[in-house]
């Protein structure tokens, strides 16, 4: 993603006024949590499926090595995603706290969708 701050600005400019006019702060936080939870649910499903595929398609020692590397990669990616979202949220510094929270949740979901694509397009055989 070349310009994450621009993505956040575009989201805020296009969608947030409508959302904010119809929702209170607590409703906005609930929507942000819903966006994040759904993206994480899809990410976990893709991750679990990849682990199953690795274990099914490889002998035990190789499978465990690959699964270990995948877990290491996933932990690092999660740290990156969370740090990137925090950076963009602070850098953007637009709107109210609730609007930033919703924008950051949407940006996090976009990063998560990219990771899901990465996990579902790993070449097979491993």
Tell me the role of every PLM-derived stretch:
Residues 20-126:
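N-terminal alpha-helical modules
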